[in-house]
């Protein structure tokens, strides 16, 4: 069994990379792949780069070249639920694009033509994530909808627009739906794990810079426990 872990930025992958044993590095199309053993499992860690195009391209390379059995996306996000705080963690049950609009042709808002309106995370991976989340102290962990777009959510008007389209939205970020779409095309199970570095629209650029490392650690800690559970 091989487990792939994807993070967009150095801050989101460095904790995991440092723990990989027998590590080998490969660069393909400027995407950084690290293979080896993590908590007893065979893993491929990918630093994808930021944004949907980078995420889709690198995920396609990952799935075609390395053939993982599972994909876990880790990293930071902006929170949308009023009950969530910086550092809290969101586990995806579904993922959607928040910047796709082909409603003029009868599609749902966020739906890419020919694709499902939302991408469903693997139920087994979600359950494993939820079980391991029970061991986490001092932060909230919720399961829900994550939305993706090629913009950082610091514009209050944009935040309110996205919230109006997806009232149940838990978090927004810049890669997950692209990763989910590619995994769906390849029929590879996935789950998204995101810790909040900011609350969307509330001085989010300042919060992001201040709390990115904390968010990355919280997300990585849960990913490590998921990897261990999958290996059992």
Swiss-Prot record:
<comment type="similarity">
    <text>Belongs to the PNP/UDP phosphorylase family. MtnN subfamily.</text>
</comment>
<keyword id="KW-0486">Methionine biosynthesis</keyword>
<protein>
    <recommendedName>
        <fullName>5'-methylthioadenosine/S-adenosylhomocysteine nucleosidase</fullName>
        <ecNumber>3.2.2.9</ecNumber>
    </recommendedName>
</protein>
<dbReference type="GO" id="GO:0008782">
    <property type="term" value="F:adenosylhomocysteine nucleosidase activity"/>
</dbReference>
<feature type="active site" description="Proton donor">
    <location>
        <position position="198"/>
    </location>
</feature>
<dbReference type="GO" id="GO:0009164">
    <property type="term" value="P:nucleoside catabolic process"/>
</dbReference>
<keyword id="KW-0378">Hydrolase</keyword>
<dbReference type="InterPro" id="IPR010049">
    <property type="entry name" value="MTA_SAH_Nsdase"/>
</dbReference>
<feature type="binding site">
    <location>
        <position position="153"/>
    </location>
    <ligand>
        <name>substrate</name>
    </ligand>
</feature>
<dbReference type="GO" id="GO:0005829">
    <property type="term" value="C:cytosol"/>
</dbReference>
<feature type="binding site">
    <location>
        <begin position="174"/>
        <end position="175"/>
    </location>
    <ligand>
        <name>substrate</name>
    </ligand>
</feature>
<feature type="active site" description="Proton acceptor">
    <location>
        <position position="12"/>
    </location>
</feature>
<dbReference type="GO" id="GO:0008930">
    <property type="term" value="F:methylthioadenosine nucleosidase activity"/>
</dbReference>
<comment type="pathway">
    <text>Amino-acid biosynthesis; L-methionine biosynthesis via salvage pathway; S-methyl-5-thio-alpha-D-ribose 1-phosphate from S-methyl-5'-thioadenosine (hydrolase route): step 1/2.</text>
</comment>
<feature type="binding site">
    <location>
        <position position="78"/>
    </location>
    <ligand>
        <name>substrate</name>
    </ligand>
</feature>
<comment type="function">
    <text>Catalyzes the irreversible cleavage of the glycosidic bond in both 5'-methylthioadenosine (MTA) and S-adenosylhomocysteine (SAH/AdoHcy) to adenine and the corresponding thioribose, 5'-methylthioribose and S-ribosylhomocysteine, respectively. Also cleaves 5'-deoxyadenosine, a toxic by-product of radical S-adenosylmethionine (SAM) enzymes, into 5-deoxyribose and adenine.</text>
</comment>
<dbReference type="Pfam" id="PF01048">
    <property type="entry name" value="PNP_UDP_1"/>
</dbReference>
<dbReference type="InterPro" id="IPR035994">
    <property type="entry name" value="Nucleoside_phosphorylase_sf"/>
</dbReference>
<dbReference type="GO" id="GO:0019509">
    <property type="term" value="P:L-methionine salvage from methylthioadenosine"/>
</dbReference>
<dbReference type="InterPro" id="IPR000845">
    <property type="entry name" value="Nucleoside_phosphorylase_d"/>
</dbReference>
<dbReference type="GO" id="GO:0019284">
    <property type="term" value="P:L-methionine salvage from S-adenosylmethionine"/>
</dbReference>
<keyword id="KW-0028">Amino-acid biosynthesis</keyword>
């Amino acid at each position: 069994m091989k487990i792939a872990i994807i993070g967009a930025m150095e801050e989101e992958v460095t904790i995991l990379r440092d723990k990989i044993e027998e590590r080998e590095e490969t660069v393909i199309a400027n995407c950084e792949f690290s293979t080896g053993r993590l908590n007893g499992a065979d893993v491929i860690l990918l630093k994808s780069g930021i944004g949907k195009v980078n995420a889709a391209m690198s995920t396609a390379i990952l799935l075609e070249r390395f053939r993982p059995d599972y994909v876990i996306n880790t990293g930071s996000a902006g929170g949308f639920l009023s009950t969530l705080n910086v550092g809290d963690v969101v586990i995806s049950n579904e993922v959607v694009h928040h910047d796709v609009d082909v409603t003029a042709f009868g599609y749902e808002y966020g739906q890419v033509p020919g694709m499902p309106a939302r991408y469903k995370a693997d139920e087994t991976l979600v359950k494993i994530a939820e079980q391991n989340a029970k061991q986490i102290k001092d932060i909230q962990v919720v399961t829900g909808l994550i939305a993706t777009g090629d913009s950082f959510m610091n514009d209050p008007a944009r935040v309110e627009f996205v919230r109006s389209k997806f009232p149940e939205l838990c978090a927004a970020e810049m890669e997950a739906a692209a990763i989910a779409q590619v995994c769906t095309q390849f029929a590879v199970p996935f789950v998204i794990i995101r810790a909040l570095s900011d609350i969307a629209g509330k001085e989010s650029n300042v919060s992001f810079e201040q709390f990115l490392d904390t968010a990355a650690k919280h997300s990585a800690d849960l990913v490590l426990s998921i990897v261990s559970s999958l290996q059992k």
